[in-house]
Amino acid sequence: MSNTKITFYPVKNGDTNLIEFSDGVNMLIDCKFRSEAEAEDNDDYNVINDLLTNKLTTKKKGLPYLNAFVLTHPDQDHCLGFAQKFFLEKNPEITEPTEEEKESKLILIGELWYSPRVFTEHEDDLSDDAKSFKKEADRRMQLWKTNDSTKDKPGNRIRIIGYSDVDDLNGIPDECITAAGEEISKLDGKNHTQYRFFIHSPFKKAIEGDSRNETSIVMQIRVDADSSKDAGKLIFGGDAEWRVWKKIQEKTSDKKKLEWNLFEAPHHCSYTFFADDRENDPEESSLNFLDNRVGNGYIVSSSKTIKKNRFFVNFGGNISSISVCIK
């Protein structure tokens, strides 16, 4: 059995993170597929080419297969290109992909992770890619609401991150819903023993601050390696600002759920993890969260190169992608 590998793709300020678990299952957290990076005369890293050529080697229905796609929140730098790169709006069990769709290598998503709150509160302020994601989530939810016989097939599965009292979720079975404070090990229709997901947010009630960013999915992923349980503790938080991280610490009684040895800097290493304004002193709660590091922890910034200033030191160099292997 191979080790779990995490690839942070360089998409400037944005997120595209691929987790390849030790059992062969894969998960993509957010996407930013920049069309200009696909041009032959462009030196930017061609993310979609790497995914299709080197990563998504399993096929279903003649399409590259991704076990799970997680959208932390629907800002454009987290879902750019979604509408163009994935097989959407069709039930693959009923409508076979066309030859054109196969030649275009549209990606079939086994299970979609969807947090409905931000979509319902900001429906008029969504990009075309975010609307496309919402439309696909609605299609899958309708299969579960009507108890369609194909609802739990690859390409139709959905995981709701939120609460069942939202109107849109009427009729969705509890098995498809995971709320803040809950842990799951089921992914793409199967229970897994080598890794597990603890959901920290979004919360049921809104908190003060940027209402889009405070609804980001924040989760801890714990993965085993060989005989070591929870050898890797990964935390992803989209664009969650400091108030979210403060409340997470207040609500989490099991402090092991706050531990990390790999932490993606929220909001592309923005000051909003520490304070409302870059001139403000960092909030103590944010500094306390960083103390949850276990061992030789690493923080990854999904951003443009951070230039030297009074807060940061640039360790420099042009990178193709960052890959971390948990052993």
Where are these regions (language model features)?
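Short amphipathic alpha-helices and their capping/turn segments at secondary-structure boundaries
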Residues: 247-257, 287-290
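A short, acidic, amphipathic alpha-helical segment used as a generic capping/interface helix at domain edges
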Residues: 279-292
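Flexible, acidic/histidine-containing loops and adjacent segments that form or flank the divalent-metal
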Residues: 2-4, 61-68, 80-241, 317-327
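Active-site metal-binding motif and surrounding structural segment of the metallo-beta-lactamase
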Residues: 27, 38-112, 254-272, 299
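Conserved beta-strand hairpin/beta-sheet module of binuclear metal-dependent hydrolase folds
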Residues: 2-64, 215-240
